[in-house]
């Protein structure tokens, strides 16, 4: 099955908003064993939308179209669809009823602009939108099935999950020549994408049913595995075999699979160890704490954090001795170690993490230029450990990789530590 996605709207092609619908659709279809072959962004230009619809329908079995279904003058995607199909727009009584119900629930009546959303191409199938006013519209164009969805991500996702994906799945199941697929997304940190590619290359001949793919989601790199076979059992077996080999190759650089998030994995590793954590952050400005507290239940193991940006607060809040700051500066191995030890003592936790550095664009010294970061871990029974890293890129990138490296020091320590009885 060939699937294409057409996203409409001037706001997409001018950079005013970022298209997130396509990445969501690609990921969800990948779970079904379907690869999106093409994604097209087109502005609010009628001839361009009409031509794009015709071209996509000539190539694909399924075309998912987002945007341009609302009540305003620049919402004319369905008008373009009707023209592409050579049929008129018709006012649908059921959609009219849905609109009146939705507006009445808010004590309103739909105005003439809102009623435009009831006009759909002749012969199409409107489907009620559980999250908004504009319906999903399903129609045929040539040999392709077209799904028209609102561009609002919340509405797009609801209709995709509730209607579009089940229909695509049913079509796949009904095909006698169906290729069965199985998937795994291996999430890594601390290994460059180029090294992943080199490590995976020899596996291809040994696993002919596997399609390897790569995705960078800084600071992570992901390895995508897709098995294709004549039956589901064969696809599952092929995936299991290659996954074993990949896990052996990646070792502890592999932190999770599929939808497992890094911060959640770190917190779960802490929880299994019966340990607690506190952090002292300077250049990252609370980014580590933000990542951890975004995970529900993090308070079970994450006790607290301090953003100690100035030298004064490094001493006042986490007990960095003033003479350490005077001799070694705020960005140094000695200061990072004192921060980690100080926040651990102050919070009474098993572990203390710290990070201090030059995120840029200003600052830095000849010995420690912009991008230099010191990350430290204070742990029971062992000397405090500090690692110096050098990150290239802008301020946000330095902060992102500094936070990642600091947490990874803790994760690797926990993996190497003896299991709690």
Curated annotation (Swiss-Prot):
PANTHER family: NICOTINAMIDE-NUCLEOTIDE AMIDOHYDROLASE PNCC, NMN AMIDOHYDROLASE-LIKE PROTEIN YFAY. Gene3D superfamilies: 3.30.70.2860, CinA-like, MoaB/Mog-like domain. NCBIfam families: cinA_nterm (TIGR00200), PncC_domain (TIGR00199). Belongs to the CinA family. It comes from the Bacteria. SUPFAM superfamilies: CinA-like, Molybdenum cofactor biosynthesis proteins. This is CinA-like protein.
